[in-house]
């Protein structure tokens, strides 16, 4: 079963994920050095019991993925709301003020994630027009 990437990502490969897997075939391991929306990994057509390795330097993105995995319902509380420009700007400022701390927590504790930060980031990344959200 394939899954759809839950948010848009510049350079995302959702449109070519099927072709990537057709060319890869049934690999025993998968490494994604620039995770982004994980469109290729989520588009894997076959169940997989090998090693999947994903990485991304962006702490807010990494937090979002960890919180989606561990605290999905709580993330949804912060992410699923109407679009408001004021909210987007306020959430971006809130995230930027905490970005270094969030990244440090992720690096220090494999079990840590912040659902509020993930929800704000997902809301912003889905609503922002153009590039530059939390850059």
Where on the chain are the PLM-derived regions?
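Class I S-adenosyl-L-methionine-dependent methyltransferase module
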Residues: 47-135
């Amino acid at each position: 079963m394939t899954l759809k990437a839950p948010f848009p990502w510049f350079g995302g490969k959702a449109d070519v994920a099927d072709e990537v897997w057709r060319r890869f075939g049934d690999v025993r391991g998968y490494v994604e050095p620039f995770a982004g929306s994980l469109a290729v990994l989520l588009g894997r057509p076959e169940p997989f019991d090998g090693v999947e390795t994903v990485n991304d330097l962006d702490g807010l993105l990494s937090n979002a993925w960890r919180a989606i995995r561990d605290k999905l319902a709580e993330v949804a509380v912060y992410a699923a709301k109407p679009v408001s420009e004021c909210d987007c700007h306020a959430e971006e400022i809130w995230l930027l003020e905490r970005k270094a701390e969030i990244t440090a927590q992720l690096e220090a504790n494999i079990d840590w994630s912040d659902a509020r930060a993930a929800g704000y980031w997902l809301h912003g990344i889905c609503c922002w027009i153009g590039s530059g959200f939390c850059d």
